[in-house]
């Protein structure tokens, strides 16, 4: 799949499907499909643990439709170019500033993603802080003057397409800002399906030091490919607690509420500790 050189390139739903589906849609369909909502902090090892868990169920990871925002972002050539340029001007103390460029990319409605302005503002921010402190976020000044859908919106379009074709789905996400995302964003689309899904929410956890080491390794690999998707190591503690809190909120809600089409029996909640590789069914 070629890179998205502008947001125009990403507007084709077939391009999104091609990224999410490793096989033809018909090969991913099921009369009794699963939706695996895979949550956890970045670098916790969600993909590896989900693959192992599915294999134990007699299912294969590649036979699922993989809904992932990061998989779309990695196709955005302006994002890759910008983050790599900025990365070379950062230190370990302010590498988290790359998150600002990531957020600008996924929310942008501008045909060129408006990344140059973001890049310049972040470099200025680094210089003002002496390279050691993160200043407060600046306000966006780029007008959203095109009717194009953002990458976040395109992810949901791709998700909806998979649901309407009742394919087995893995929805890979980090529950940080929106702790109620499963109820407010994911389930309304699942409920559109012509067939009923079995929903399994998997929270992958690990010790903080282990996650930081994995992120550093992942960053080295990304740098070799001329781009980087960064998480500030100092934010790991907060991300771990946010995902665990969101998991418990969803578990409490879905295991105690009858929503009509979907009942508590249609949901399963599983914790996987990737520090010890011990699975905990809770």
Residue map of PLM features:
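Glycine-rich phosphate-binding loop used to anchor ATP phosphates in small-molecule kinases
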Residues: 143-194
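Conserved phosphate-donor/acceptor-positioning beta-strand/loop module used by diverse small-molecule
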Residues: 193-215
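The conserved Walker
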Residues: 41-42
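N-terminal pre-Walker A segment at the start of P-loop NTPase domains
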Residues: 2-27
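Conserved glycine(s) of the Walker
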Residues: 45
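Conserved substrate/cofactor phosphate-moiety recognition/catalytic segment
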Residues: 54-165
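Conserved GTP-binding G-domain of TRAFAC-class P-loop NTPases and closely related GTPase folds
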Residues: 209-282
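Hydrophobic positions on the alpha1 helix immediately C-terminal to the Walker A/P-loop
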Residues: 49
């Amino acid at each position: 799949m070629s890179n998205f050189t502008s947001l125009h390139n990403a507007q084709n739903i077939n391009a999104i499907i091609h990224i999410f589906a490793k096989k033809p849609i018909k090969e991913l369909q099921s009369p009794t499909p699963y939706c695996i909502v895979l949550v956890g902090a970045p670098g916790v090892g969600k993909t590896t643990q989900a693959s192992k868990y599915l294999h134990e169920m007699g299912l294969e990871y590649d036979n699922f439709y993989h809904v992932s925002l990061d998989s779309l972002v990695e196709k955005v050539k302006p994002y890759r170019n910008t983050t790599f340029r900025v990365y070379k001007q950062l230190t370990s103390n302010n590498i988290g500033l790359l998150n600002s460029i990531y957020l600008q990319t996924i929310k942008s409605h501008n045909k060129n993603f408006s990344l140059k302005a973001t890049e310049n503002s972040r470099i200025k921010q680094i210089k003002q802080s002496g390279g050691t402190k993160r200043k407060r976020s600046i306000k966006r000044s780029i007008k959203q003057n095109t009717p194009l859908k953002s990458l976040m919106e395109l992810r949901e379009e791709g998700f909806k397409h998979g649901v309407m074709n009742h394919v087995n789905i893995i929805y890979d996400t980090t529950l940080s800002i929106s702790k109620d995302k499963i109820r407010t964003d994911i389930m309304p689309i699942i409920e559109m399906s012509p067939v009923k899904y079995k929903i399994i929410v998997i929270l992958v956890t690990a010790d903080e030091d282990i996650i930081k080491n994995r992120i550093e390794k992942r960053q080295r690999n990304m740098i070799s490919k001329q781009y980087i998707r960064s998480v500030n190591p100092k934010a790991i503690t907060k991300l771990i607690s946010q995902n665990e809190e969101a998991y418990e909120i969803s578990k409490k809600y879905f295991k105690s509420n009858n929503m009509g089409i979907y009942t508590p029996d249609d949901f399963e909640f599983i914790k996987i500790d990737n520090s010890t590789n011990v699975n905990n069914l809770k």
